[in-house]
Amino acid sequence: MLIFETYLILFKTVQITKRRIERRRLRLLNQCFTKKEGVSNREMASYNYVEVLQKSMLFYEAQRSGRLPESNRLNWRGDSGLKDGKDVGHDLTGGWYDAGDHVKFGLPMAYSAAVLAWTVYEYREAYEEAELLDEILDQIKWATDYFLKAHTGPNEFWAQVGDGNADHAWWGPAEVMPMNRPAFKIDEHCPGTEVAAQTAAALAAGSIIFKETDASYAAKLLTHAKQLYAFADRYRGKYTDCVTNAQPFYNSWSGYVDELIWGGIWLYLATNEETYLNKALKAVEEWPQDWDYTFTMSWDNTFFASQILLARITKENRFIESTERNLDYWTTGLVQNGKVERITYTPGGLAWLDQWGSLRYAANAAFLAFVYADWVSDQEKKNRYQSFAIKQTHYMLGDNPLNRSYVVGFGQNSPKHPHHRTAHGSWSNQLTNPPSHRHTLYGALVGGPNAQDQYDDDISDYISNEVATDYNAAFTGNIAKMVQLFGEGQSKLPNFPPKEQVEDEFFVEAAVMHNDTTSTQVKAVLYNRSGWPARSSQTLSFRYYVNLSEVFAKGFTEKDIQVTAAYNEGASLSPLKVYDASSRVYFAEIDFTGVVISPRGESEHKKEIQFRLSAPNGSNIWDASNDYSYQGLTSNMQKTTKIPVFEDGVLVFGTLPDK
């Protein structure tokens, strides 16, 4: 056994050494290329690509739904969507929220997972070098675990959780969503080929990248991938005909043939079985004969990705030529029907396809260019495609006319107001309140500028300033490639992410409504503005402390003081309780136990009470000036630490009187 273990260690050491030598060789080759292209050493490594990669992956952690593990690194994220699937009798918790909303749309989620897995398939060594391989696998596994849950039968898959219309009508953190979250499925009676085949691709690609570290899990993924692909192939139908709720958000514009090609390719790569390659090639024949070259890979259309993989696998000219037409259109342009056609370029050099997520499309095209450049033997094409991908990536990181990063939490003047409900952290169902985000959504790539390089960091702009799992997928791969090219000597940030400083989450604002020698009336509002993470509570209370020295001096006791309410939104009031008998300090407890106070709406996040402490009529023994909780109060509402707040009996805000 010892001999075997020693051999295994030596074998792994040799493999690691070989990988390092190969990475060094690639770097030297690519540095030669970049110098030929006129790119200086300073420009080549003008960013810490390992840091960008580290942050880009953290974005997926921020998108997690379900019960979060102990390893959760974001103190502003908590468990959410724990009842997902309950309406249909299945556990559909987990997965990723799609974008700045909280719907779990199956098609873009599966696409994002598949592309992320593809980035590991291509650039595993770069992730290893950055010491981020375990992390990217963990992020992908969060999605593939969910797909396994959602695949409840060979021909049954839950393609969506959450109603897009209801979800988009509310603005607040995922942890306190108020709406019902229905689940929608596809099956043999109402199929959805796009989602089934795309998920099969994600699971098949996942099986490849997990095989080295967890063979049993990889085998499980592959089993489900085969079943889902068989389901997609046998029972064909447009998924939005069955999951109609997805139509306004993720309609299948390109149809399902591209997903059948894509899924077949990944199953072939995972199994090496010609059957799947033949199925993919057969599906190619069903694709429109006039292959488009003016678009790029997206959640809706994976043909542009598939043709690159098929070019590598089959070496057929039709796939090679189609791939190069597409990449030429995005780079230098190509002559079609006697005229040069080329993607629109902004004055600052962004390859600009569409306003809605302009950077997402440029990142996707860049990833395809990187992958193809790695394979093509023609040095001029290799240089051209790789140069394009590098420039597009650098544009996103800050090499643009605005000199700003489009990655949240990275670089110069990065976005501060992405269209993202949970990161914003509103407690009042308003995207304008608070005026600034409470949380940093590290690593998120925003939609991006218009065709004139103009961009406004506006939370309300979901076209240019939203984020999404598909936006970051290929972008993450591009950064991994940049690590491979230029990341030598770079390292990830230590102790990242930093723990956010927690603001006052629970507190009381109060004002004096009346005060004389017989009574004091106070208006108090108890707030739940929790955000680390946001959470509803039914066990909140606060205490109002008084000093009864003058009452006892006149021969009265705490039992002579009444505590009553003129206006009350659900609290119970206690008679005065002793706090420090020697100092004659007592308190009234205003207890909202059983009343839900939640940071999910203007009225829902706060509760008001107007209470009075009264001495016997005509006694004239009352003097509030020495009362602890009265200190600093005026006729205007203000936050006060002298009215402490408790949750389930534990102090969560304010200070107690000295004893």
From Swiss-Prot:
Record domain CBM3: where: 501-658
EC number: 3.2.1.4
Annotated segments matching region Catalytic: 1-500
Activity modulation comment: Strongly inhibited by ZnCl(2) and by EDTA.
InterPro entries (UniProt xref): 6-hairpin_glycosidase_sf, 6hp_glycosidase-like_sf, CBM2/CBM3_carb-bd_dom_sf, CBM3, CBM3_sf, Glyco_hydro_9, Glyco_hydro_9_Asp/Glu_AS, Glyco_hydro_9_His_AS
UniProt subcellular location: Secreted
GO cellular component term, pick one: extracellular region
Region described as Disordered: 413-433
Active site: D101, H419, D457, E466
SMART domains, alphabetized: CBM_3
Main location group: secreted
Signal peptide: none
Family: Belongs to the glycosyl hydrolase 9 (cellulase E) family.
Name of the protein in its database record: Endoglucanase A
Gene name linked to the record: eglA
